[in-house]
Amino acid sequence: MATFKDACYHYKKLNKLNSLVLKLGANDEWRPAPVTKYKGWCLDCCQYTNLTYCRGCALYHVCQWCSQYNRCFLDEEPHLLRMRTFKDVVTKEDIEGLLTMYETLFPINEKLVNKFINSVKQRKCRNEYLLEWYNHLLMPITLQALTINLEDNVYYMFGYYDCMEHENQTPFQFVNLLEKYDKLLLDDRNFHRMSHLPVILQQEYALRYFSKSRFLSKGKKRLSRSDFSDNLMEDRHSPTSLMQVVRNCISIHIDDCEWNKACTLIVDARNYISIMNSSYTEHYSVSQRCKLFTKYKFGIVSKLVKPNYIFSSHESCALNVHNCKWCQINNHYKVWEDFRLRKIYNNVMDFIRALVKSNVNVGHCSSQESVYKYVPDLFLICKTEKWSEAVEMLFNYLEPVNVNGTEYVLLDYEVNWEVRGLVMQNMDGKVPRILNMNDTKKILSAMIFDWFDTRYMRETPMTTSTTNQLRTLNKRNELIDEYDLELSDVE
């Protein structure tokens, strides 16, 4: 069992405060929680194991045994995980509060050590100091933490994590915050704790302390779509489905600016127990709208593009072409269940075809053209440089004419009514016969921004907001979209 989990198991028997704070799921209890193949460290009990999704943020950071408590590091309730979670900027004073909490919950003194030794020796053949019997006394106090960057906030989940060398399949990365504190002071704390242990255990304690307090921080990982579970969605088959979030709260709401002060509540045991007795849960339905999910969807669309359509003469829109091996697209992919992506794909391809037909003498959709390789990138609006380069290459392929230092292309081929409306909306109420580079970029981006305006999107889904932020957005009625009514961003 993990050292931190062992310590919680044994120390929770000390007093009423510890029994409330150090409650973790035991490994010998089977729980009907979905196990995933994601390997990493459970933020609740710090053990390395298979992780399942959190019902508070949709990230994979909880093991099957701890999932029964539904704790999230973004909760308002000051449970142990929340008290170990800090937000940047972390000050020396904040770390002092964390260390004081550790000393309060996991004390080591002569009386306590003798109590644990006598408890172990009551069992047969346990006169030796085997490490597995005294694992709970071998947890040093370190500033080892797992970190993650969510929106503009960096979170640090302090704890004692074993097996740091193992594969990490989560977006959380190990950092050492020893430089934010005094190295000698931390050494002194641990040497004092260690002095109460038998010599054999002192050696192991020292080895663990230095290995977990002198390591180099790893670089931060970038979040990806696969880091978030789909299990919180109301309807996994609906692309506009809301996500159900559950957060643990308390009656006395703590402001986010006091985030790092949560660990200091443990000092007043009576007050802390009173606060925990007022705990309750809040449920929120939030939109999955964010750049991370949008980038993922458009990445799939870009791989399914049939660029030959822009040279074709098919009367039907791009997604409805049949019996043409060059233009027919496989529309059975789940991504096409999103009506917004269907509209965008059809409109962008129709507009590009109008530009090509207006400026280039082409024959049939079976022709092989150099511009094909840039067409998929026209849907990668989140990758600004790549998207701009694709538009420029398309524009140059159309052989623009230079007029007074500005290059123009023609637009005199028929477009569908929806594209016509979008062009008029962005070109002062009319459909121009000639377009320059900026006009082309403006129209193509507008077709995507009409439904996915990435300029004003969050980077990550709202499930990564703090409980106070969710509460505020809910009061403003800003947690959900109107996409189910087929209303666009513009409307």
Swiss-Prot record:
InterPro entries, per database record: Rotavirus_NSP1 (IPR002148)
Region (Zinc-binding domain): 42-79
Subcellular location: Host cytoplasm, Host cytoskeleton
The entry's keywords: Host cytoplasm, Host cytoskeleton, Host-virus interaction, Inhibition of host innate immune response by virus, Inhibition of host IRF3 by virus, Inhibition of host IRF7 by virus, Inhibition of host RLR pathway by virus, Interferon antiviral system evasion, Metal-binding, RNA-binding, Viral immunoevasion
Region feature (Interaction with host IRF3): 320-491
Segments carrying motif pLxIS motif: 485-488
Gene Ontology terms: cellular component: host cell cytoplasm; host cytoskeleton
Effect in UniProt of substituting C54A: 90% loss of IRF3 binding. Complete loss of IRF3 degradation
Recorded superkingdom: Viruses
Main localization, broad class: host cell
Annotated stretches, region: Important for cytoskeleton localization: 82-176
The keyword Plastid belongs to this UniProt entry's keyword annotation: no
Transmembrane segments annotated in the record for this chain: none
Gene Ontology biological process terms in this record: symbiont-mediated suppression of host cytoplasmic pattern recognition receptor signaling pathway via inhibition of IRF3 activity; symbiont-mediated suppression of host cytoplasmic pattern recognition receptor signaling pathway via inhibition of IRF7 activity
Residue numbers spanned by region RNA-binding: 1-81
Function noted in UniProt: Plays a role in the inhibition of host innate immunity by inducing the degradation of key host factors required to activate interferon production such as IRF3, IRF5 or IRF7. Associates with components of cullin RING ligases (CRLs) including CUL1 or CUL3, which are essential multisubunit ubiquitination complexes, to modulate their activities.
Entry's family note: Belongs to the rotavirus NSP1 family.
Subunit and partners: Interacts (via C-terminus) with host IRF3; this interaction leads to IRF3 degradation. Interacts with host IRF7; this interaction leads to IRF7 degradation. Interacts with host CUL1 and CUL3.
Protein name: Non-structural protein 1
Species the sequence originates in: Rotavirus A (strain RVA/Cow/United States/B641/XXXX/G6P7[5])
